[in-house]
Amino acid sequence: MSDVIDELAAQWRACRHLLVLTGAGLSTESGIPDVRSATTGQVRQPGCADALSLRFFQQDPAAFWSAFRTLFPFGTTGSACPDIGHRLLAQLAATDKTVTVVTQNIDGLHQRAGSPHVIEAHGSVERLVCPACLCRDHDATCQVQPVPHCHCCGEVLKPDVVLHGEPVEAMDAALAALAEADCLWVMGSSLEAGPVNQLPALARHWRMPSALVNLQPTALDSRFDLCLHWPIGEVCAKFRQILGFDSD
């Protein structure tokens, strides 16, 4: 593993603007389960996609919110803390290089860790939005209501995340960030969810150095210059040692 991490460190030293696409595997050490896991992922269960769809939210808001809170309980507790992966990316961003994070996660942990440039591809479970008036000014008391309502217009609030049937509006920002970057890393993503899984192919087309850090192989491994199939926590700890970063 050390030789490959040395190559990862060489990519870091050579780049000026690193783009990092992160997935659920980056947050598992924070105690947040990978809902897309091949063995335990809830979103693979029959009917789950329908329960997390815009259509179901519109048809039965109460049932939708019950299902959503079962799948994503961390959204109402805020108890999860950034792990070594989140902290490493924030530490890299504090150097003289630019680090942009495009995250598929909805847990807000990159921001809590201190990363300044975060594009939330799928939104954030920590926010609520009114689909009628688009108001986002809702306090924490709304989060604990069985069916939260907008204090501006009274309509049922939606979690500010991308549901099945909704477009990934942040994709434009992700593409713009990739165009400005000169290195792409993917950390903790199976690269099954589109459209952000198109980024590795674009990076390959542009001959951009790239690396994948994910416990399991993906169908897109051939798109990367480096593939590290080890626990992210171990990779990040070794990477920090190589760069001489202090532990925290």
From Swiss-Prot:
Q: Which residues bind nicotinamide?
A: I106, D107
Where is it chiefly localized?
cytoplasm
Q: Where does Zn(2+) bind?
A: C130, C133, C150, C153
Subcellular locations according to the entry: Cytoplasm
What this protein is called in its record is NAD-dependent protein deacetylase
> Briefly, what is this protein's role?
NAD-dependent protein deacetylase which modulates the activities of several enzymes which are inactive in their acetylated form.
User: What species was this sequence derived from?
Assistant: Laribacter hongkongensis (strain HLHK9)
Give the EC number(s) listed in the UniProt record: 2.3.1.286
Gene Ontology MF term list: histone deacetylase activity, NAD-dependent; NAD+ binding; zinc ion binding
The answer, when asked if Metal-binding is one of the entry's keywords, is yes
Entry similarity comment:
Belongs to the sirtuin family. Class U subfamily.
For this chain's record, the cofactor binding note is: Binds 1 zinc ion per subunit.
Named cofactor requirement(s):
Zn(2+)
In its keyword annotation, does this UniProt entry include rRNA processing? no
One Pfam family, short name: SIR2
